[in-house]
Amino acid sequence: MVKMDVVRTTGFFLRSEPTTCRITTFAYSAEIIYFHAETTFLFEKIMKEGNELEKYSKIELNSEIWEDEEEEDNSGIVSQNERLMKLVNKQREIIYELHKDLEKVKKDNTSLRMRLSKYESTDSFPSSQPSRANSPQSDSYSSPYEKGKLFPKISLKSSKDVPTASAHISSSDHEKSSSVSLSALNNYNKTTDIKARSLDRLSDMTRPKLLLNTKRSHRSSEEPGASSPVTSPILKDSQKERIQALRNKAIKTYSVSTESAERIDSIRSDNLSPLSLNTSSFRRPITKPTPFNSDSNISIDPKDNNSNKQDHFAEIEDELRQQFLDIKVGRANASSPRRKSISIVKPHGISSPKHSTNNLSSKSGKFHSDFRVVSENVLLQARSETNSPIIENKEANNFLAPTSNVPAYSTPARPTESPPPPPISSSSTTPRPDDKPSLPPRGLSEDNDSLSLQKTGSSDTRRSSFSTLKIPDSDICFTRRRSDSNRTWTVIDPHHSQSFDNDILAEIPTSKLDNSSQKSPGKLSSKGLLNSFSPISPFSKSKSHNHHPSSQVEKSTSNSKGSMLPLDTLYNNKLSFRLDESLVRYLRFELMKTSLASLSPDFDCIGLQFVVGVSASSHLASQWKDEVWSFTRSIGECRSFATSFVLDIGAPPFPTLDWFTNDSSVIQNELLRRSVDTYFRYIFQTDLKLEQRIKLLEFLSSDTLREYLHDVFFLPPEHAQKEGVLLKYIENSGLVSRYFYLKDNILYFAENRNSPVLGTIHLKDAQVNRYNANLPIFSIIDPPHEFLTGENYQSAFVIQEKQTETRTGTATVHVLLARDVEDQKSWLRAILRQVPGSTSPLNASPFSVLSSDFPGSSRYRDQSSPIRFYGKADSRPVSQEAILSQDISSSPSPVLPPSENVASYADDSLVSNLTMSPKLRDSMEQVPLENHREFEISDRVSELSFDSSTGSVLEIADTRRNQDAPEKHVPVIEIQSSRPSLEKTDQSTPVELLIDSHSQNSQNEEKRSRMKFWAFPHHKAENYEQISDTNIPVIETNVMLSPSSTTSAEPLQKHIVRKSGIFGLPLNEAVNISTQFNDSGLPIVVYRCIEYLESCRAEKEEGIYRLSGSASTIKHLKEQFNEGVDYDLLSSDEEFDVHVIAGLLKLYLRNLPTNLLDTSMHKLFELLPNVPNDSAALGELCDVISKLPPENFALLDSLLHHLRRIIAFEKVNKMNIRNVCIVFSPTLNIPSDIFMMLILNYDHIFTDISRQTNGAQNESDSDVSDDNGEDNEFF
């Protein structure tokens, strides 16, 4: 018990120093009175809350009795009420124990008074009345010194020396107030059945505690004269030593940390009176001090200054109110990193005392402030009943004076006789922990003017001290380090000569600093706040080599106004700055991205990558440019930061190893990433203190990449040359709509307009091509499905970036799809203008193609490289000189790295030099300029043919005649080659492309179906019939295809003869062949597969379409369909697994040369967001689907109907709509969002009217109607 400790410790003084014991006992009694009043208040409050809770719980219980027992929520509510009742009972029991403790303390206090009265009856003090002891039943206690006014005057202590929480008043007054409070508490206890009503237990830190580490040694002060009828006994030296030993022992028996005292004070702050008495923080005594005497005796002054009693207590009340405000402000600034030493100034006419100064401690002072409170009624009663103010003189010793920092506002300067203080040395800025700041003794001048002057000066100094909190400029310096990127920054310790002296800053009036820091941004200099920073790291060079930082400090401190002048900043780096208070306060952080940078078996070694956006508030908006900070930290570093970074209650905790299990590494990684992201996002969004902001910047300052926000492309560029929507192919996702911006040789793309940029495409040294399925540039792409083949994608184009160390392979190839051919041409014109070296569309950068990857080209290749063909971006004619003066070799081309797809052609070079033969130059000179055909981007059509006889000459021509001038000949470029050329024939025939085949026995049907751009090097060449037309102009070259050319189905049908095979045929041809066997209107493979699956009830097979079947069986069935076209799976003698048939259906759909939705993809993307909520959009969607070709519509209708049957049994087969979309979205090359939208709106889209508009036959219409009937069966 704390009270028992008080009694035992007080007993140490009983045998040697009775007067001091009386004072101590009365002080403790005042504290007991306060704690009685406080406990009574808590008792009333908790009893009221307990009654309300009990009443509420009874009402709830009664209401629950009348409710039906069938309700499931009854048990939960009853259990909640029971818990509330248990909580209330527990609270009552614990407060009952608290009252028992208080009753015990009252008895101990009574026994202590009896012992003290017995001791006083035997002392040698003369008294006007005989001493009498107070009985335990008495309500008041009178001291023998009360009527004689023999109580000594004790001066009030300084702000850090008085440990008690109440004023030192006379014994009678104190006993009266004590008896009043105790009797009130007893009466309250009589009216309240404490045993019947138990209270909530308060925490240990709210229990009443008394301070034991108290310094109570006094010096006697005697006034010469015969007016002192009573003198205190003189203690012997042995008694002094014993008392001193007992006090030292009392210190060791009780100690309370500052943090626990702060918690106690925070809990009681709501219940304390504003008129709190804080004798531990008084800055001046109340009355005039008596002369000091070297003896440690106490002299009693019987004279009472009754005339000044009212003024005296008025000063007490003013001081109390001032101290209450100071305490509130002082707590907020208690953790200030700055510290100032106060110089002692002695004015003339005042003699200094003969003892040393007292040592103060901010730590002990804060602890004392927790016990400084006395209720207002006690103070008023003391003011009305006391007869003599108490004055206490302090003895100069180091008893109970711990070493700590002294806040500047707690120690006002005392006037002395010394001259003005000398300059404070720089060593005082960083004192050692053992240094003990000094405090002048308590003494004032004789006149009231000096008293008021000191009071005013003290308050001004105090207010100016905590009005602003300066940060030492030498703490943190953010600057760039020398590195490869030259953007890494960290903390660099500045030179000693560049650091400021904190004491010099302390001498400057803070009001001047406040005025300078509150200037508007418009009044700042050209460099703004950066001019007020200290010199930065030694990596930056100063503007003047003769200018030294020390002279700046001298110049700033010698200002006549007393304020610090802005220093000349050595600001030579855009991304370097010094930490400043205003900069720290107004910086705002936003966590943009958190990702796992590296994995490790050790939890603390896991790396995390952070991307933080740094902006400034309105105060620094004109001086700060938004930046992006990227840095990597390990889990160990983050946890150590979280341990030292104290947040409020309710903040998200930092993840620990106990959070994670061994279930799934993917889930664990995502949980770790989200937990860390949540923790730091809370830190960046909460309102941090200045010290917390400094710690946060220190955490962010190590090895951090700083870039301006617009350099990181998180925001779309302004004033773009061209912008619009394009479809972009993404691996495993298909075509995705993106919004593109073209500016400064960079193509930015975002999800929507004005949304954050997702990525960039650099056009410098890039290859730009119109889409062609045979371009070898696609050999490095290997997606799981195929698309963009044939004439249906004439609006597509491809950009291949220059490969670097960080970007290689498929990351450099971008397939883009415009709305139509005109949109494609406009984008290509804009892109060609951005290519370096091209000043206009007439001088556009050439397209380049790597031809060595084509089948059959390796046998003809030599050391030369592919040709760069020149394309035009507009329709204006090209002059002869412009074509002949083109320097092809001046435009570098990126080199494709060897890959597994082009391993056999890795030795080919990618840069070629174009040379014109004399025959070509002569032919071009003979043709008039107006008859030259433009090299249009979208008008080139190529054909493929192989020369099986010679296999040595490649011929390039244009299949389209010039309709405007049919009689003119098309000029032909001839390129030097090591191969012999064919004989030239009549040049009036159309030009065709002939390619020799290196394999005569290849399978045409398989190669036709798999001639896709990403898998082209894996396929063998197809057998084509040699064209017998000999009227073809000859061009000698080692390449075979222009990148600006595309395939056309119409001319190919005239010259290419295919073998029979259903896989890979266009959809309309496959339907025409299927009509020989059934009238379903579907390809025969689709019809047989769906028929088999539905007859075998595949919808009840778990994992249908998700599990793979036998690859050999699927290949065998594919050959059966290719050879005989129709293969009845149900009537076959062999039984097939449903997963095999499902795999066969997916294989056929994957090999379709065109997309089912064809050109309707763009319109569906526009309708996608509005379809679920807008009937008009749904009607427009039906209209778009109804305009599909009949074959596409019928296949899409049957397939979606079949998949809806699969989804209807999702509980059995585990294939919900999401899983079905995951499987068929890449198979059909339809985005999953659109595919899901088609499935969900199937009933609204595929109606009989829509089928009739597609021109379906009557039989097929009836079949489809039957399908709808089945659909109604399952939905």
Swiss-Prot record:
Main location: nucleus
Stretches for region Disordered: 118-146, 213-238, 280-306, 335-365, 390-466, 539-561, 957-988, 1254-1275
PH domain residues: 719-836
Repressor as UniProt keyword: no
Cellular component annotations (GO), alphabetically ordered: cell cortex; cell division site; cell tip; cytoplasm; growing cell tip; mitotic actomyosin contractile ring; mitotic actomyosin contractile ring, intermediate layer; nucleus
Residue spans of biased composition, Acidic residues class: 1260-1275
Ranges annotated as biased composition (Polar residues): 122-143, 290-299, 353-364, 450-466, 552-561
Domain of life: Eukaryota
Site (Arginine finger): R1106
Biased composition (Basic and acidic residues): 957-971
Domain Rho-GAP, residue spans: 1065-1275
PROSITE patterns noted in UniProt: PH_DOMAIN, RHOGAP
Post-translational modification Phosphoserine, affected residues: S388
GO molecular function term, any single one: lipid binding
Keywords on record: GTPase activation, Nucleus, Phosphoprotein
Disulfide bond sites: none
GO biological process: regulation of fungal-type cell wall (1->3)-alpha-glucan biosynthetic process; small GTPase-mediated signal transduction
Places the protein is found: Nucleus
Chain ranges passing through the membrane: none
Entry function: GTPase-activating protein for Rho-type proteins.
Protein name per Swiss-Prot or TrEMBL: Probable Rho-type GTPase-activating protein 2
Organism from which the protein derives: Schizosaccharomyces pombe (strain 972 / ATCC 24843) (Fission yeast)
Gene: rga2
